[in-house]
A protein has these predicted regions:
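Basic K/R-rich, polyanion-interacting modules in nucleoproteins and related proteins
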Residues: 39-50
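Catalytic loop of the DD-peptidase/beta-lactamase superfamily, centered on the K-T-G motif
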Residues: 471-474, 484, 490-491, 504-506
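Sec-dependent N-terminal signal peptides
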Residues: 6-13
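C-terminal motif of bacterial Sec signal peptides marking the signal peptidase cleavage site
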Residues: 17-18
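Functional-site microenvironments in short loops/helix caps that host divalent-cation chemistry
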Residues: 25-39, 61-62, 68, 73, ...
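Positively charged n-region of N-terminal signal peptides that target proteins for export
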Residues: 1-5
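Short, P/G- and charge-enriched loop/turn segments at secondary-structure junctions
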Residues: 47-49, 79-82, 472-477
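A short glycine-rich, aromatic-capped structural motif
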Residues: 51-147, 158-181, 357, 485, ...
């Protein structure tokens, strides 16, 4: 009997003890200090759970690696501006297709809504500065007025690549797209109210940087004010503003660097005989074929070689020869006299369309003939102009007339004591600056300047030579062409192999033998 009473008391004690454990919240601890994360009783330092980077709208993941950048064919132009060199490109994202007319018209629609020219005639300059130059279709001895009038506006051309856009306009579009995507994410997550966008006018509009700095006050959504809001203040109450540390917003869209664009164009992952497809499975460190063109089949030719109804068809939209932009009636070879749909032709190994032909594309880099030799061998890029947030006398940031946070160049005085760079503007570093022997007298001895930007890829009006991703040309950043469009890219945060992958090799730990 006594034993029975003892067992009852013991069971009761266990139950009471477990009830106490159930009500006690477990916290992650800092491996550096031992303090709890996200615990209001221990300082309230908020640390989000590790998150994988989501793939932004329109993008595909490009796993980085090493490749030989530069010419793959004889330099028939005699430019000697694409000397082969091995470089490494970090993983990144790039648009699956070129930016289409319908995408760019969405940008113009937003500008018209926020910067209403009827309410303020001064806003007309903002709209005009963003509009594509449709007059690029004109030629002295060709009838192209239908393209001037309708190519950008008519719904028949919705999914055709936008042209007549300068490098500066493409750069501004990338900034706008970054802000709209992040604003959309916050609305979908319930942290920003959709009703709030109705009151946006002039500089009072959402940009990612102004929101993060608190210069733009968004109207909180239902998710932000809910008790289920996972974001907390140090005191443990729901937090209405999102920070970059929360892992919800994406990095900025931007123009791809030349090395990124060229690497993505080849799609070399398709030339790996056994690529790694999941964590723990090692792939071959091998590229089986050196490609001339982006497509995966017949990598050195221009036609489909596999049997079937498409046997012999062109693999890109380009100009076969003088006076031949499409072939003969009843058997058109590329089925496009001018541009074609941004999703036409085969995608390459990374799933990217039209990296050769259709339209050539702007990349971020400033042009120099010998950039291949001068630039770093990891993430090479020429065009750095280091910036910082502009602050007024009180030390506060401010926004400009477009709602963007004002930025200013890092001065040479600020850079002089640094080991890794000594000037703020290094566009002409080792090629046009005082340290080099090169002299660029723009308009006198050369057409190369610090505003010359690279474009790549060949177009509907180019011969096959320009379809090789290794070829490169340049144009001033404020000029446009009927043969040049663009696509956007985005930095990759996290494992270079993609989501659900680790960074670095993890070996099974073994005890040392004594």
């Amino acid at each position: 009997m006594q034993a029975k009473h003892f067992l009852i008391l013991l069971s009761s004690a266990v139950v009471l003890g477990s009830c106490g454990l159930i009500g006690k919240k477990k916290y992650d601890k800092s491996e550096a200090t031992g303090w709890n994360y996200n615990d209001k009783n221990m300082g309230g330092y908020q640390v989000a759970q590790t998150k994988e980077q989501a793939t932004g709208p329109g993008l595909v993941f490009v796993q980085g690696g090493t490749f030989t950048m530069g010419q793959t064919e004889e330099d028939i132009m005699g430019d000697w501006n694409n000397i082969p060199r091995r470089v490494t490109v970090p993983s990144f994202y790039i648009d699956r297709t070129e930016v289409a007319n319908v995408h760019y018209r969405e940008y113009i629609h937003w500008l018209n809504r926020i910067f209403d020219a009827e309410a303020d005639p001064g806003n007309r300059a903002i709209i005009d500065a963003a509009l594509p130059d449709t007059l690029v279709w004109r030629s002295e001895l060709s009838y192209n007025e239908p393209l001037v009038e309708y190519y950008f506006r008519h719904p028949s051309f919705n999914d055709y690549p936008v042209v007549g856009v300068s490098w500066r306009q493409a750069y501004d579009y990338s900034l706008w797209r970054s802000d709209r995507v992040n604003e959309g994410i916050l609305m979908q997550k319930g942290f920003v109210s959709p009703q709030g966008i109705q009151g946006q006018q002039q500089e009072n509009n959402f940009t990612t940087k102004s929101y993060l700095l608190g210069l733009y006050q968004a109207q909180p959504g239902k998710g932000a004010t809910s008790k289920k809001n996972p974001l907390k203040t140090p005191m443990g109450t729901p937090r209405t503003n999102v920070t970059m540390e929360d892992g919800l917003m994406l990095p900025n869209y931007r123009l791809p660097f030349e090395a990124e664009w060229e690497y993505a164009a080849y799609g070399y992952i398709n030339q790996n005989p056994r690529p790694s497809t999941k964590e723990g499975k090692r792939g071959e460190e091998l590229v089986s074929n050196k490609q001339v063109y982006p497509w995966a089949q017949n990598v050195n030719g221009l036609r489909e070689t596999r049997n079937g109804s498409w046997h012999g068809q062109f693999l890109a939209n380009f100009k076969r020869g003088s006076g031949d932009n499409a072939g003969v009636a009843g058997g058109l070879n590329d089925r496009a006299i001018y541009t074609a749909s941004v999703k036409s032709f085969y995608p390459n190994g990374f799933g990217i369309f039209n990296m050769a032909g259709n339209v050539a594309e702007w990349v971020a880099d400033v042009y120099r003939p010998l950039t291949m030799l001068d630039a770093d061998d990891v993430s090479p890029y020429r065009g750095n102009k280091f910036m910082k947030i502009y602050k007024i006398e009180s030390g506060e940031a401010e926004i400009d007339s477009m709602g963007r946070v004002k930025m200013t160049e890092v001065t040479d005085e600020e850079s002089a004591s640094r080991r890794n760079y000594q000037r703020g503007n290094v566009i002409n570093f080792l090629d046009g600056d005082s340290l080099s022997m090169a002299s660029y007298g723009y308009g006198k001895t050369t057409l190369v300047s610090d505003k010359s930007r690279v474009f790549k890829g060949g177009s509907w009006n180019d011969r096959a030579y320009w379809l090789s991703p290794g070829t490169r040309r340049h144009l001033e950043e404020d000029q446009a062409s009927s043969m040049i469009g663009f696509r956007c890219a985005m930095d990759r945060m996290g494992s270079p192999e993609g989501n659900k992958r680790k960074t670095g090799n993890f070996f099974k730990q073994r005890k040392q033998k004594r």
